[in-house]
UniProtKB/Swiss-Prot annotation:
Protein name: Phosphoribosyl-ATP pyrophosphatase
Localization in the cell: Cytoplasm
Species of the source: Bacillus cereus (strain AH187)
One GO cellular component, as annotated: cytoplasm
GO BP: any one term: L-histidine biosynthetic process
Amino acid sequence: MKNAFTLLFETIKERKRNPLSESYTNYLFSKGEDKILKKIGEECTEVIIASKNNDNEELVKEMVDVMYHCFVLLAEKNISLEDIMEEVTERNGKLSRVGDRREIDTL
């Protein structure tokens, strides 16, 4: 049985291959990468607001929106979930130290 993430990603890829005129996913693909990236930015802002408001129910919903739009971006760039899982697996269990990260100089 496939998990919800796999099913969602497969649906997104299917919309890319076989567009439906009333599909929001198809709308995003038709507008291109800039629109997809704009939506990811908007949804990330909504995640921040929900978190700052301590609204966990809204936070879950907004996180799903971020993930959906990131999946659309992955499909747009022809990156598979397997590619993402391989990277997660590669990183899993590795020590990461604060000193290993570059400092953020400006925001």
